[in-house]
């Protein structure tokens, strides 16, 4: 396993739309393993392949406190099951150090493939619903900062660009 480099906003590669996985093979399972290692190391609760510059529709997440509930979503799709919205303070490994409130549908139905390529469906609410929507956004080239005002997004962008310059 390997820890992968996480792209940071405003890197344009984060805007790439990920391609579906045709076959879940050993290379995809290795990617999943590397993504889990990267996510746990960061630490985070979710990671999309786009964030590690692999433009395939793969998401990993683990909402547990003790890394005991790893979840894999390959080619995930979701649909909202309610018009009711929940507001959560979201953060992102690609937007480090920033947390902002985002409104999202509070209940969604997810369809995806698991680590072995087997299809499954899941009804998600609360943090799981927020997380899957956030990670699916990554696969579509969208970030949580896109839900913010231009002023907030530009402020975050400028601060991260300054941090990047200071590290260079």
Swiss-Prot record:
Cofactor note (record): Binds 1 Fe(2+) ion.
Listed InterPro entries: Peptide_deformylase, Peptide_deformylase_sf
Keyword line: Hydrolase, Iron, Metal-binding, Protein biosynthesis
EC number: 3.5.1.88
Domain of life, per lineage: Bacteria
Gene Ontology molecular function, alphabetical: metal ion binding; peptide deformylase activity
Reaction it catalyzes: N-terminal N-formyl-L-methionyl-[peptide] + H2O = N-terminal L-methionyl-[peptide] + formate
SUPFAM superfamilies assigned to the protein according to its UniProt record, in alphabetical order: Peptide deformylase
Cofactor requirements of the protein: Fe(2+)
Database matches in Pfam families: Pep_deformylase
BP-aspect Gene Ontology terms: co-translational protein modification; translation
Residue numbers binding Fe cation: 92, 134, 138
Summary of the function given for this chain in its UniProt record: Removes the formyl group from the N-terminal Met of newly synthesized proteins. Requires at least a dipeptide for an efficient rate of reaction. N-terminal L-methionine is a prerequisite for activity but the enzyme has broad specificity at other positions.
Family: Belongs to the polypeptide deformylase family.
PANTHER family according to UniProt: PEPTIDE DEFORMYLASE (PTHR10458:SF21)
NCBIfam families according to UniProt: pept_deformyl (TIGR00079), PRK00150.1-3 (NF001159)
Name this protein carries in UniProt: Peptide deformylase
Species whose genome carries this gene: Ectopseudomonas mendocina (strain ymp)
Name of the gene: def
């Amino acid at each position: 396993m390997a820890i992968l480099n996480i792209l940071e906003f405003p890197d344009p590669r984060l805007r790439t739309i990920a391609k579906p996985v045709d076959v879940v093979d050993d290379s995809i399972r290795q990617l999943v393993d590397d993504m889990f290692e990267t996510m746990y190391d960061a630490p985070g609760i979710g990671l999309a392949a786009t964030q590690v510059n692999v433009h395939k529709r793969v998401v990993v997440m683990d909402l547990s406190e003790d890394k005991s509930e790893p979840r894999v979503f390959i080619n995930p799709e979701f649909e909202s099951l309610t018009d009711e919205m929940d507001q959560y303070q979201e953060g992102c490994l690609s937007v480090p150090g920033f947390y902002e409130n985002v409104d999202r549908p509070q209940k969604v139905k997810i369809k995806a493939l698991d680590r072995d390529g087997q299809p499954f469906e899941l009804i998600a609410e609360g943090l799981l619903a927020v997380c899957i929507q956030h990670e699916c956004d990554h696969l579509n080239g969208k970030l949580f900062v896109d839900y913010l005002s231009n002023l907030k997004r530009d402020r975050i962008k400028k601060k991260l660009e300054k941090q990047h310059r200071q590290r260079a």
